[in-house]
Amino acid sequence: MANAKDLKVTLVRSLNGRLKAHIACVRGLGVRRIHSPVVVKDTPENRGMINKVSYMLKVEEA
């Protein structure tokens, strides 16, 4: 199950018209569709991708 070192990431804005690098970050996190949450580990790599596209995501502790 999820523990304190997991993050629940949800895409809340569309990827249409975004930079290719930002789309790659969202895909790298495993998010596929708007409003479908994904649980990822809280690592520096994932935090970096989340920070880069934070304007499109909602992040909660899982």
Swiss-Prot record:
Pfam families: Ribosomal_L30
UniProt xrefs under InterPro entries: Ribo_uL30_ferredoxin-like_sf, Ribosomal_uL30_bac-type, Ribosomal_uL30_ferredoxin-like
Cellular component annotations (GO), alphabetically ordered: cytosolic large ribosomal subunit
GO annotation, biological process: translation
Keywords associated with the record: Ribonucleoprotein, Ribosomal protein
MF terms in GO: structural constituent of ribosome
Tree of life domain: Bacteria
HAMAP family per record: Ribosomal_uL30_B
Family: Belongs to the universal ribosomal protein uL30 family.
Protein name stated in the entry: Large ribosomal subunit protein uL30
Organism: Thioalkalivibrio sulfidiphilus (strain HL-EbGR7)
